[in-house]
């Protein structure tokens, strides 16, 4: 058995082994504000699907990120993550991020007056439908994938690992996870 769980490198590793992994690195953007006085440390994570935003408390600051529908492909010249790349950043593209930041002001008005401490633009792996890729690939028996978490890998890893192990051991799973099955493509 083989489990491919290599994040944004999964597609090109799949290509190198004759397996199609529909996952692509795209630019992912977020900002971290300057410290905000009296910001609750137990603030819930806010996900605004209408405006493609997520917001969360980050050590007394707010992190505002986006999962936009029209993302910018990363490494578009080669369509491959460079072999020497190690979670670096891309040049700032505030023009792309600004409309989303402005939309966040209606959700959390105090953001309008908050300073920006950090602007981040870096690669993250995304699938065409933004759902995770799990299961046995159609091209190679006993070759499983567990990737394409679109920035939610840490939170999903335990359950995805459990399901992948069950799939490998039993040849099937109890849950209906077709929306995540790599064979949906």
Predicted regions located by residue number:
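C-terminal catalytic lobe of FAD-dependent flavoproteins
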Residues: 42, 50, 59, 73, ...
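Flavin-dependent oxidoreductases
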Residues: 1-78, 82-91, 99-110
